[in-house]
């Protein structure tokens, strides 16, 4: 039996992939049932391969990254921390670096620095409606089920 490994540790990669696969399978089932699905989690481009694979299965997958300025991100994270302050700051700084320049996925980012929750929801809906955050598969661009990551 395996025990939980804190997700930020390097040795948690296999566990993190299992979590992504579990999200993915649940999302697919809901989507096949006719539901639009939003997966809310930390999904960096390094975890997109499984999502790109389901595009080949005709799922419509939008990849949207909510990102505030570094200062605002640090403020929000410290306010809701479950870890000690020093560990939390270190983790958030690491994640900030990982998400600060997403290369080809920069167009998928919504800057939430000054957004209220309502503003953020509106921006996400707009991004979905516009199709600007869709993931595409080189082999097949057809889509039929809607999943937002």
Spans of model-derived segments:
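Conserved ATPase "switch" residues in P-loop NTPase domains
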Residues: 27, 31-32
């Amino acid at each position: 039996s395996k025990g939980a490994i804190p997700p930020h540790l390097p040795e948690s990669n296999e566990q993190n992939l299992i979590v992504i696969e579990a999200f993915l399978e649940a999302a697919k089932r809901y989507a096949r049932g006719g539901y639009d699905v939003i997966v809310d989690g930390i999904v960096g481009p390094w975890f997109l391969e499984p999502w790109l694979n389901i595009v080949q299965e005709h799922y419509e997958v939008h990849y949207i990254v909510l990102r505030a300025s570094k200062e605002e991100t640090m403020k929000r994270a410290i306010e809701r921390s479950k870890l000690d302050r020093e560990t939390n700051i270190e983790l958030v700084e690491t994640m900030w670096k990982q998400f600060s320049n997403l290369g080809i996925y920069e167009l998928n980012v919504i800057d939430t620095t000054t957004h209220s929750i309502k503003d953020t929801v509106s921006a996400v809906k707009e991004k979905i409606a516009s199709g600007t955050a869709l993931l595409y598969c080189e082999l097949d661009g057809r889509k039929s089920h809607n999943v937002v990551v």
